[in-house]
């Protein structure tokens, strides 16, 4: 009987120690690109209505690129920081008579960062140095599936009708 109590006490102490070792770890977790993309989508969902983007300071840059779309820039967001929930540029494409949000684009001035900014977690994102506009840029195709990948600069599914480009500067350069 004494051995049974001793064994039970040892088992109880061992179990308590094991339980304590498995307790909640309150160390912050590193974001993943999926959680960052979800944050970007949550923050920009409202901009599916172009009038909301305009009200929040995005202005048409009058730069249109085939396989990208119409770019709307919020210059007040241009800085040396990458913030997934604050894209500097929204990209729209005409669809059924209205402008559809297809992607967000991040931009960091080249003069504020000598190398590509740290962006989404992992290595899937690929920033481009666009010397014509003086920006590091990165697209995230959140609202239009892109067969080439969410971070690819262009999207073959975006084919703009030349009739919609009147008054725009059509820029064939891919950034």
Where are these predicted regions, by residue range?
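Bacterial signal peptide processing site
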Residues: 23-25
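C-terminal motif of bacterial Sec signal peptides marking the signal peptidase cleavage site
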Residues: 18-21
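Bacterial N-terminal signal peptides that target proteins for export
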Residues: 1-10
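Primary mode marks residue(s) on the alpha4-beta5-alpha5 output face of response regulator receiver
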Residues: 27-175
């Amino acid at each position: 009987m004494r051995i049974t109590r001793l064994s039970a006490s040892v088992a109880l102490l061992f179990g308590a120690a094991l339980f304590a070792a498995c307790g909640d770890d309150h160390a912050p977790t590193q974001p993943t690109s999926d959680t960052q993309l979800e944050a970007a989508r949550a923050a920009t969902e409202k901009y599916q209505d172009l009038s909301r983007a305009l009200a929040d300071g995005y202005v048409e840059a009058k730069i249109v690129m085939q396989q990208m779309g119409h770019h709307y820039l919020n210059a007040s967001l241009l800085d040396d920081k990458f913030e997934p929930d604050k894209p500097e540029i929204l990209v729209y494409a005409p669809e059924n008579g209205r402008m559809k949000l297809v992607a967000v684009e991040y931009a960091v001035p080249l003069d504020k960062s000598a190398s590509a900014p740290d962006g989404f977690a992992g290595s899937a994102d690929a920033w481009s140095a666009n010397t014509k506009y003086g920006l590091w840029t990165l697209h995230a195709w959140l609202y239009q599936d892109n067969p080439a990948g969410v971070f690819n600069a262009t999207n073959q599914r975006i084919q703009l009708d030349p009739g919609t480009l009147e008054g725009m500067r059509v820029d064939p350069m891919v950034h």
